[in-house]
Amino acid sequence: TTIKLILDIIKKDSGSIRILGRDCTSATTILKEEIGVVLDEVGFQECLTPLQIGRIMKDIFHNWDPSLYDQYLQKFNLPNKKEFGKFSKGMKMKLGIAVALSHHPKLLILDEATSGLDPVMRDEILDIFNDFTRDESHAILISSHIVSDLEKICDYVAFLHKGNLVLFEEKDRLLEKYGIIQCTKEQLQELDQSAVIGVKYSSYNVEAVVLRDQIPEGFKVHPISIEDLFIFMIKGVH
């Protein structure tokens, strides 16, 4: 929903949306020049080839870079004369990424942009996204269920659950802030319960995500991943 609102696909009920310092509704044309978009379903016509798509994009975007587009087609091993409808899901996603990057956007909006890719190609794509954000004037807004991807490229993480913003914080701060401990039920009760984020019970022990600065001495603290944190927050009993 957030991405659809930003792209003006659906209308907001209230409030305002600002992208790159501009109100989305009053600067649509300018913003479209500065935003690259990759949705989970890449929507080019089935009969078009990458070569034809490139020609169309040249008429749409003032900053379209044919040379850069060709480089991405070669990098992704995409045949420029094959019809889009005959591409696999992964090939379609790679073409969408090539198009999104080839008009020199300042902001990339990615909705499940690495889904359908094999692990090696996904890692290469993430490297490209990391290169993109090395320019401090560039940013990426990514929505993904592949949480490991978020850990690799994101500076800030927002977690939406059932339409509510559960968490928004700097990624590195989150990883420093929380830890996982294993203990008994009795030891768990001795902890400050306000510092316990989520708990998983097994027949042998208890796993809990706890604020690191509230963990007493004597507990072995294991590092946490963003995925672990999300799972404990939603599924862990608290």
Regions found by a protein language model. Give the residues of each.
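ABC-family P-loop ATPase nucleotide-binding domains
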Residues: 33, 39-95
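Conserved ABC transporter NBD signature motif
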Residues: 15-26, 30-31
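C-terminal coupling/interaction segments
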Residues: 197-238
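Catalytic Walker B motif of ABC-type/P-loop ATPase nucleotide-binding domains
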Residues: 108-112, 117
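Helix N-cap at the start of a conserved alpha-helix in ABC-type nucleotide-binding domains
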Residues: 119-121
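Helix-to-loop junction immediately C-terminal to a conserved catalytic motif
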Residues: 7
